């Protein structure tokens, strides 16, 4: 019980310290057209295809430049692993945890193919243009829920992969470049909608 209390206290402290700084992302979003994608499930990277289509249609059908569009993708739940680096997928067996298989090896996925897919990976529409990295270059902002990281850490501890506190710190320290960790997905979505972001669950 003491260890669990210590872990929860550590998570609370991290959240408290980072809450103000983690809201800095709100000031980066200047586009007139604003869309938030709520993503609790990996679903083969369907959201990445939706985001790409969203940007493409604004440009091709309406002539709107990407600088005038702001897109947020909020990752939590089973989609939490999408926000961390390959090293974490291998170390904590994240592919096995969400039942994903590497098409190149037929073994549980040990890399984040949503971030940087290889040829043949079943992500989005199967092209690099649907990768997280490509969408980030187009201005898309990915948010990662700290609460979800905490729940994943507790789950991985039960699998004998370390203590929850150590795992939580490791996952936070290996978020994908450009991914912003927020205290809670639900609060981030509320803050975005208060700033006129349309909402869609994807």
Predicted regions and their residues:
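Solvent-exposed loop/turn segments at secondary-structure junctions
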Residues: 42-44, 77-82, 142, 147-152, ...
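Glycine-rich, aromatic-bearing surface loops/beta-hairpins
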Residues: 157-202
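Loop/turn elements at helix/coil->beta-strand transitions in domains of secreted/extracellular proteins
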Residues: 32, 67-71, 137-141, 195-198
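N-terminal secretory signal peptides and thylakoid transit peptides that target proteins
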Residues: 1-15
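Acidic helix-start/capping segments at beta-turn-to-alpha-helix junctions
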Residues: 64-88
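Acidic/histidine-rich, surface-exposed loop or edge segments in extracytoplasmic proteins
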Residues: 27-42
């Amino acid at each position: 019980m003491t260890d669990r209390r210590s872990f929860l206290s550590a998570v609370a402290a991290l959240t408290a310290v980072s809450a103000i700084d983690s809201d800095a992302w709100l000031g980066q979003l200047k586009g007139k057209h604003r869309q938030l994608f709520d993503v609790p499930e990996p679903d083969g990277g369907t959201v990445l295809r939706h985001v790409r289509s969203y940007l493409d249609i604004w440009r091709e059908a309406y002539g709107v430049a990407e600088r005038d569009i702001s897109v947020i993708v909020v990752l939590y739940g089973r989609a939490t692993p999408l926000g961390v680096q390959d090293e974490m997928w291998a170390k904590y067996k994240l592919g096995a945890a969400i039942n994903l298989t590497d098409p190149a090896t037929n073994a549980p996925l040990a890399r984040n193919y949503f971030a940087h897919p290889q040829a043949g990976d079943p992500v989005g529409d199967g092209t690099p243009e649907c990768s997280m990295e490509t969408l980030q270059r187009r201005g898309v902002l990915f948010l990662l829920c700290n609460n979800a990281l905490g729940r994943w850490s507790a789950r991985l501890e039960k699998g004998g992969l370390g203590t929850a506190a150590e795992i939580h710190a490791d996952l936070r320290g290996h978020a994908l470049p450009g991914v912003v960790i927020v205290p809670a997905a639900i609060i981030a979505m509320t803050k975005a909608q208060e700033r006129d972001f349309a909402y869609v669950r994807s």
